[in-house]
Amino acid sequence: MGFFGFGKKEKDKMKTGLEKTRTSFWGSIMNTLTGSVIDDDMYDELEEKLILADVGGDVAVHLVDKLRDRVQEKGLKTGEQAADALRDIIAEEMTPEAEMDLSGKPAVILVIGVNGVGKTTSIAKLADYYTRQGKRVMLAAGDTFRAAASEQLEIWADRAGVPIVKAGEGADPAAVIFDTVKSATARGYDMVIADTAGRLHNKSNLMAELSKISRSVKKAAPEASLETLLVLDAITGQNAISQAREFCKAADATGIILTKLDGTAKGGCVVAVKQRLGLPVRFIGVGEGIDDLLPFTPEGFVEELLPREWKH
């Protein structure tokens, strides 16, 4: 693997998926930086453009303040140097404190999120990604509240070439996931990826349901590790982050999957997620194909968003 952990195929997918974002709002940001002297006008214009790119007002101010400090500390003189500094700052802001914990036997990933954000397809894409990494993956159809959710996931499981455990509509999700983890453990599978309900009536219901699922995982396999990934739709941007805040608190999420990045010209919500939600982005969706979910690397993302070889 080359480019920050990516091979050429992944780098090309990232480049293509972020084209709309790179050539619009973020291209304008590059023009501001590389076409200006470093002064208050440049900082003001940069802040405005970061807000337009859907970074959010508070995060835009934070980034510009950090850039001012970095420019002063390092004695930077040119717009190109300021652009380099901004790249570094954004990558630092998005860097997770730790890698995902997939050390368990099996490693269990719960996937949560409201309906319509691409949760089911993200599960299949995760299964495909980890299968290509040499893992044996089993899916759990834990969204038993929505008609056809299990059938939809079964179709995607077939495409990904992985087995799935499911039950009838209205079955207990914790029981379905318990059975899946038990089966995966008995059959020597490395990983279970579990769907969960996309809509529960209130926060306490959600907390109770996910707490019950967590207990069922540990009961089924005491050696299991557990990650909970929240799926957000990048097209809805800052609205997605606002809606997710309460969801995160209730669900005890450990990371984010950001879908549909290829469908937005803004993309700034990726930069804002970690600071606003306190959670790292783990994967990004850059297309509709089953292999269009990429592991998120801050440096690789920033290099595509704010390319060093920039032509006005």
Question: In which residue ranges do the predicted regions lie?
Answer:
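Surface-exposed, interaction-prone regions with an acidic/low-complexity signature
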Residues: 4, 17, 251
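Short glycine-rich anion-binding loops that position phosphate/pyrophosphate groups of nucleotides
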Residues: 197-199
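Primarily NTPase-proximal linker/entry elements flanking Walker-type ATP/GTP-binding cores
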Residues: 15, 20-144, 149-194
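Conserved catalytic-core segment of NTP-binding enzymes
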Residues: 152, 172-187, 201-310
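C-terminal effector/interaction modules appended to NTPase cores
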Residues: 2-3, 76
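Switch/coupling subdomain of P-loop NTPase systems
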Residues: 2, 9-13
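Short beta-alpha junctions and helix-cap segments that line functional grooves
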Residues: 3-5, 98, 126, 242-244, ...
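Short hydrophobic/aromatic patches at helix-to-coil boundaries
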Residues: 195, 311-312
